From Swiss-Prot:
Keywords linked to the UniProt accession: Antimicrobial, Disulfide bond, Fungicide, Plant defense, Secreted, Signal
Protein name, entry field: Defensin-like protein 153
UniProt lineage: Eukaryota, Viridiplantae, Streptophyta, Embryophyta, Tracheophyta
UniProt source species: Arabidopsis thaliana
Localisation per UniProt entry: Secreted
Top-level taxon: Eukaryota
Family: Belongs to the DEFL family.
Protein encoded by which gene: LCR31
Length: 81
């Protein structure tokens, strides 16, 4: 009886890992940088554009490219791939 319960627990554990893996798949966020004028970022406009264009959410961050000015903010959109 003890072996049967251990096997059933192992089967349930494997099944739950498979279901969790399939559920997470496809929900890995992608990142896209949107162009903005005057090196400024309006959070509400960024959020609205990302929701409309990518069905995701946006946030304002400093640029990550070498030629970006230090004080400039850019809109980055996070959306499901």
């Amino acid at each position: 009886m003890k072996n049967v319960s251990q096997v059933s627990v192992a089967v349930l554990l494997i099944f739950s890992i498979l279901v969790l893996g399939i559920g997470v798949q496809g929900k890995v966020p992608c990142l896209s940088r949107m162009f903005n004028k005057n090196n400024t970022c309006s959070f509400l406009r960024c959020e609205a554009n990302c929701a409309r264009k990518y069905k995701g959410y946006g946030d304002c961050r400093p640029g990550d490219r070498p030629h970006d000015k230090k004080d400039s903010l850019f809109c980055f959109c996070n959306y499901p791939c």
